[in-house]
Amino acid sequence: QAANMNTDRFGAYKKSAEILVHQILEETWQPKEESHLLVLHASNHRTSNTLAIWQKVKERLDDRIRIQEINLRNGTLVDCSGCPYKMCLHFGEQGKCFYGGAMVENIYPAVKWADAILLLCPNYNDALSANMTAFINRLTALFRTTRFYDKALFGIIVSGYSGSDLLAGQLVTALNMNKTFYLPGNFCMMETANNAGAAMKLPGIEDRIKEFSEKMTHILIKET
């Protein structure tokens, strides 16, 4: 931060506090007449409860929301290995990352295009999946030169037994607090379903899907 702001650590602290207070007092988020939504997942369509819920949410979203879906399982998404700061900044200034691949060719352009991102996160071990973690880590190179204040964060999390709140917290700390994505209230839909196909049989699931879809539309699309 200090290097980015051309100051020392204390100067960066004061400047960051000033930016934070300004953002709190003057919320800048504005819905649009047409919005772009990037959906990221690393799941199997045939067995995924998380994807099953997303398909129903998708059906209820306003037609003015343009959707792009990327499956992080398609090809190998190499995780960040912690390049030196100046090297990461150098590649970030070119909209690239040292490790290249799908992250640079497909995902960076999609993130730039998006007004919001929706992460589909099945919970197996109270942690985001390896591919999802790699996406967040590799986003750092782009973040060196691009802030994401004007992009909203949403999530759908399905746990076999418990722990959805832990993954929601990871999304908040990694993408809102660290990467500056805009965080709407109740940004995440959390469900508990163990066996394949169980999510869509949960009591009240259709009502919760409707509520979440309407919330996303309200955040992204300007009322006419």
Question: What residue spans do the PLM features occupy?
Answer:
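Short, intrinsically disordered/low-complexity patches at protein termini
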Residues: N131, N137, F143, D150-A152, ...
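A short small-residue
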Residues: A2-A3, A116, M189-A196
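Short, glycine-/small-residue-rich phosphate/pyrophosphate-handling segment
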Residues: Q1-L20, F148-M189
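N-terminal beta1-alpha1-beta2 submodule of the flavodoxin-like/Rossmannoid cofactor-binding fold
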Residues: G11, K15-T145, G197-T224
